[in-house]
From Swiss-Prot:
Record carries keyword Metal-binding: no
EC number(s) from the headed UniProt entry: 1.5.1.42
Name of the gene: rutF
Annotated PANTHER family: FLAVIN REDUCTASE, FMN REDUCTASE (NADH) RUTF
Protein name (record): FMN reductase (NADH) RutF
Organism: Cronobacter turicensis (strain DSM 18703 / CCUG 55852 / LMG 23827 / z3032)
Amino acid sequence: MSEQQAFRDAMSRLGAAVNIVTTDGPAGMAGFTASAVCSVTDSPPTLLVCLNRNASVWPVFQANGQLCVNTLAAGHEALSGLFGGKTPMEERFAAARWRRGVTGSPQLDGAVVSFDCRVEQVVPVSTHDVLLCRVLEITRNDDTHGLVWFDRHYHALSRPVCGLAS
């Protein structure tokens, strides 16, 4: 087994939230499914998003300089598949309801949370760009259950009925 395949297999065992990252601006509207998203700091609120420079959406995100990270809820598996494949952009966005945040990037109705961001710095790392994104607006939906990607499958999360014992 190659080192690359061993790494991919190991990473499949690292559970992660499923996100649809969207943008809209002078270069047009685009979106993709991502699990390579995480918090950097809360002062100021900053996320990082990893984007492959060979992805068809890369030039749009690069030119727009803004994005929204929409964390998917249980039940969004099909939508994740649309944004993770070769489906045309119009069909991707037609499959759900969207609103606009402060940057104008599409925010998914029913997302667990949406982080509307301005891209502040881009760091190239091998095949990807690491986008450091300043969070300008947060929209939460506390009535949803989470969705994670683990072992190459979706898993719905539910809230516990009671808190953890101390």
